[in-house]
Amino acid sequence: MSGHLHDTLYEDVREQICRKIYEGVFQEGEKLPAERTLAQMLDVSRITLRKSLELLANQGLIVKEAGSGNRVGLPNRGTPSSTDMIVLIAPAENPFFSEFIRAFQEYGQNHDTMVLYAEKPRRETLADSIYRFYQKHLYNIVIWPEDKEVDKEKLRRLRALGMNMVFFDTDCGIPYGDSVVLDNKRAVGQLNSRIAKRGIRRAGYIGWESGPRYSGSLREQAVREAKGADILVRLPWERRREARNLAYEYLKNISEELPPAMIYADWECGDAVSNALSLLDREDILLAGIDDFPGAREKHAIVCRQDMENTVKEIFHCIQIQNQKPAQWQAEIYCIQGKIVEY
């Protein structure tokens, strides 16, 4: 058998063992089956198996212990690889997406990196989607999960297998991937400051009551810590397609006097509250929040825009560090300052 075929066989066996590690068949700290048993399980010779185990040991996925066999290891470190291509998983239906991917692709083109876009998976889990790219030897991936649940244990295994991961708008990847997010606390503080400059001392807040929405929960927390909210409207995330009607019904039936300003959590909440206030003939109420919503300019809203240029730059920097300094790398949350626009 030629050297190339040998190498391919060793790699195939290595991948079979990696899959069992990813699926949790072989757990961290557990001993692998004895060589004879494992060779029979994988239908390969013991000589082939030993070479494949050597590849895994070099990667840190198994630890050879004299007299006690091979134990599974899950190192949490970066992996040197080619950055000629980076995978981006993101929700295409989000209007903010077009601005995000445009900035992402432009930065990639300027730095000789191709961007392979994949829509946020609908049927398979996020981890399984990432694993498919691992199988295709694409080891650098940026994930914007939005409301997609993340299996932290599987992220841990993916990191050990060699995936370099950066997450946008969430901290769900910590400590197995970096996070690049808007500086939500600062953004809310800036909005409150601009509202106060207009002589307004009372403001309400509209956000989401459920869903794994990292940014939404941080923004509500920042509002509470700053000075609270005269009214707090939480729309159910699972009914977000009805957000306009829900916001209208809530504000129409509220017993308290509406405050002179409303802070919204994101563009969807901004659109919902803007529509509700128009129907209630309360367009005198100032709107302020994160990201533009349709009609923000006409409503003279105060908007904190996310800085796409610096956000994407930081994401690429995170990927670079994971590749170039794998042993020193530790996952961090990078907060990017937004830009205030007053229409």
Predicted regions located by residue number:
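N-terminal helix-turn-helix
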Residues: E28-K64
